[in-house]
């Protein structure tokens, strides 16, 4: 704002939400302050372009170069009406939750799911999505205080979710990492399903429905 840009602050929301909202709301770019799956002191910045895609490495390098130069040389700053405006919009998280729910055509009615939010960005959105799809949701690690993100919880510390699933006789456990751009699953026996196994399950379902192009999955 100090150099003329207008900013909409969405609050604490998942990284994928920013990627979606940038395009859906017609923003020019998105920025996320995130420690991802790391402890809270390790924050970095992720940028998205106006289409919701990560910036190419060469563009990020240019941004870093610009920031370093700006630190050494005072920028010309606007005054008066030229200064950007700040808007706080707490509804953006709900818009993202609504979008996710409506991309899923399967009801979770009758399922008991333990959700581990890693005390992170999806601590509110995750339960909202799952309960909105009809599941009975048992929440753990959904009380972020700014310091406890990823601390012995979430997808990097799956043991607590394994125990909780069996304690509650749940059908499934879902664990996000701190910024909720990845997840692991735990089955009803407490066994962990990693990313490769999750992709396999999704691929088999898509193949069954005739939606898996060339019967091929590409992962990175």
Which residues does each PLM region occupy?
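N-terminal small/polar loop signature for handling phosphorylated ligands or for N-terminal nucleophile
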Residues: 1-42, 128-186
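Solvent-exposed amphipathic alpha-helical surface segments
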Residues: 3, 70, 74, 209-210
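Alpha-helix capping and helix-loop boundary segments enriched in small/acidic/polar residues
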Residues: 9, 117, 148-153, 190-194, ...
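Structural motif
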Residues: 10-12, 33-34, 58, 116, ...
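Short alpha-helical
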Residues: 16, 121, 201
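Conserved beta-strand elements of the Class I
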Residues: 29, 112-114, 218
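Gly/Ser/Thr-enriched, mixed-charge loops and adjacent short helices
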Residues: 43-168
